[in-house]
Structures are given as structure tokens and as C-alpha cells.
Amino acid sequence: MLPFEAIRRSVEVSTVRGQLKVGVSYDEFIRIIKLLVSLVEVDEAWYMRQYEDVALAIREGIFASPRAHFASNGYLEGRMPFPILVDEQWYLEQNPDVAESIRRGEVLSAQEHFNQNGYREGRLPFPP
């Protein structure tokens, strides 16, 4: 785990109207995110099956592993590191547009929507 102190040194802390505020450059923000994401467990076999372009890039030596791709690019591209099970009822309650898409036959399920678009769009798969 990345030590808190390592992150704290990377940001500017100030007080605004009695509240602590944290400021960071975009480049530093991305660096911190990549460090944190590098700690995520990646289901490497699933990742290679799910993302054929990544499998090709690994075979060509562009990336060392699925985990390396996820940490450097995949997370920022909105790729999932492993299969994530969706709470169908909750997801549809939170996302009426998805329920409507299912009704119209555009997607088969909340799970399919989440896998294809929802994760990348920042939708939650189950209650926080």
C-alpha cells in the first residue's frame, strides 16, 4: 500500500474558510492514481480474453503483463481489472435509462450494460 506520507508530500494543503483543501496538478493527480491502481489485483487470464488488443500488445512486447497494462493505461481507459457482478435490481433503479434500453431491446441486462458501458461511464454496479 502506498504510504499516506508519500501522497501527502505530493499535494498542496491549504485552509480555505476554516476547511483544509488539497490541491494537486493534473499530472501529479494521474501519477498518484497510477500508483494506487498498480496495487489492484488483475485477473490476468480474464483481462486478456476481455481485451484482445491488450493480449496482442503483450504478445508484441509493448506491455509486460495485463497488470502492467491496467496500471499504466487500462484504468484510465475505463477497463475493468476483473469481472464485477452487478446488483441488477439496484442498478436498474439507479439507472432508469438502462432499464429503458433493456425494454427497447438495446441491451439484454444491467450486467451487459455495465460491462459494455457502465463501468467506463463511472456507474456503480451495486450500492456503495
PLM ranges: what are they?
Residues M1-P128:
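Charge-rich, low-complexity intrinsically disordered regions
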